[in-house]
């Protein structure tokens, strides 16, 4: 069974405390509930969560939707985006099955990054490591006015921005859910992968595409 790995990188730094982190928790839960009602996603999508603040860690390893359990997210500390990219690169290398002459490996991972601030570590060394792993579509979300879209643009061409209120964050995760749904249908029905924002559902009004 070829899996569609999905990695969520979530900023849990101190500036996300209060409404934003609660909105992220709710958003992820709504996303999981929605995906569990999509037979194609249930069959192919596997989800992992990596959180980053003063350091970064994989909070949920790559897990099928039925077994996924929501971790407790606590907002504290600084913004180690570079470390998160290193953790992500390592997870992709160890968890995603590569295609060989004998076996068809997993589909290329989808990656969604959400951050509300400037990186406080050496993010470029993390980016260099990330560039050495094979991924599918990568979407970075700049939450609130403090996020640095110029940094995110160096990670991926697909950057969106939104406010950090409950409604906007909820809309983002609904859109992520729809995007995973479209991706899992595409690989299931036609054996092709989504290659960018233009093949995903149109973003809701709360999301602005950063050009």
Language-model features and meaning:
Residues 1-60, 69-107, 110-114, 137-152, 162, 166-175:
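Von Willebrand factor
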Residues 4, 107-108, 134-137, 156-157:
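Short glycine-/polar-rich loops that comprise or flank the Walker A/P-loop
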Residues 13, 31, 126-131, 192:
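Mixed-charge (Asp/Glu-Lys/Arg
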Residues 22, 99, 117-155:
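VWA/integrin I-like adhesion module and closely mimicked acidic/polar interface patches used
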Residues 28-36, 87-97, 127:
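Short, well-ordered amphipathic alpha-helices
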Residues 59-67:
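Short, flexible, mixed-charge acidic loops at enzyme active sites
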Residues 156-203:
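C-terminal helix of von Willebrand factor
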């Amino acid at each position: 069974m070829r899996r569609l790995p999905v990695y969520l990188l979530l900023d849990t730094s101190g500036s996300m405390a209060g409404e934003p982190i609660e909105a992220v928790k709710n958003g992820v839960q709504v996303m999981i509930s929605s995906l569990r009602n999509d037979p194609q996603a249930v069959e192919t999508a596997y989800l992992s969560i990596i959180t980053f603040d003063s350091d970064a860690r994989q909070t949920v390893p790559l897990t099928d939707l039925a077994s996924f359990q929501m971790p407790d997210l606590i907002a504290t500390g600084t913004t180690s985006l570079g470390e998160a990219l290193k953790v992500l690169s390592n997870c992709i290398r160890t968890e995603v099955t590569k295609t060989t002459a004998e076996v068809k490996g997993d589909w290329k991972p989808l990656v969604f990054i959400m951050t509300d601030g400037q990186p406080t570590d050496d993010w470029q060394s993390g980016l260099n490591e990330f560039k050495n792993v094979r991924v599918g579509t990568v979407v970075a979300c700049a939450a609130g006015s403090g996020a640095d879209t110029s940094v995110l643009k160096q990670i991926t061409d697909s950057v969106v921005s939104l406010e950090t209120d409950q409604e906007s964050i909820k809309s983002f995760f609904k859109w992520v859910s729809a995007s995973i749904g479209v991706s899992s249908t595409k690989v299931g029905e036609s054996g092709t992968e989504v290659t960018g924002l233009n093949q995903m559902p149109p973003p809701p009004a709360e999301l602005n595409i950063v050009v």
